[in-house]
């Protein structure tokens, strides 16, 4: 966030093996969050709004996260079951408080409050190896809820000039409760001329959504979304806080990758694309595309140079207009190069 430069991670894991079975446990005494871009001029991707630390509702209870999984090895692959209980990696809009100076409401401020939903995940996965082909798949059910209730909102002080805006007049916690699922299917095979092909299909959808409303009368700014109050249906701006990062962009996507190595794997070329195929409310079969071309050259055993170009294309005719995620990201198209040295 804007006031923080680093976020620690502490976790532990235990794996137990018995014949063709594997049982694993994970535990973390702290909440591990996703690395969102900071407001740095040299970083090409930025959020339109940068929440400050005091705009977040702190997790009042102990933010313990834990999970376990079990897998069985088969003759041509494996199957697994996973469970996780913790907090979302991405923050969400938790609600809004309206403050003023004493009883005078003529100069009030809207305090947008963010938080992290409590999430439980139950998933299954499999890997199958058939000849030169590999099939991978996973599906997961997510139950997530915003644990910030009315009492927590009433206890909050204004995040902006609390000595002046010292009186809370209105409080609107969203209290989201959502059930959703995610599914990923992946196919890998070696094509002629030693070209590695990877194809992936991703989809997610909400199964059930409940929340309170936000009866506001002026426009507000929310990270990743500029929206008017008339359009501010909390269900419309719901974004999964856990699972595949593709879920932030679209509900349905196809990913294709081709990779070729030459000169004894010293030089590698990779062409990949992400296609938004969520076209239920749009005539264009592929509203947006992210295309990436990368090459990597190993100068010696320790030194590697990478060069890449990414082009992001949205659709000006998309029903969401400028709010369509890939339209927002078009300016993030970029050329990059980096030098890696391994000790």
PLM features: residue spans?
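Repeated loop/turn-to-beta-strand initiation elements of outer-membrane beta-barrel proteins
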Residues: 20-23, 76-79, 132-136, 194-198, ...
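C-terminal structural cap/anchor segments
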Residues: 178-286, 290
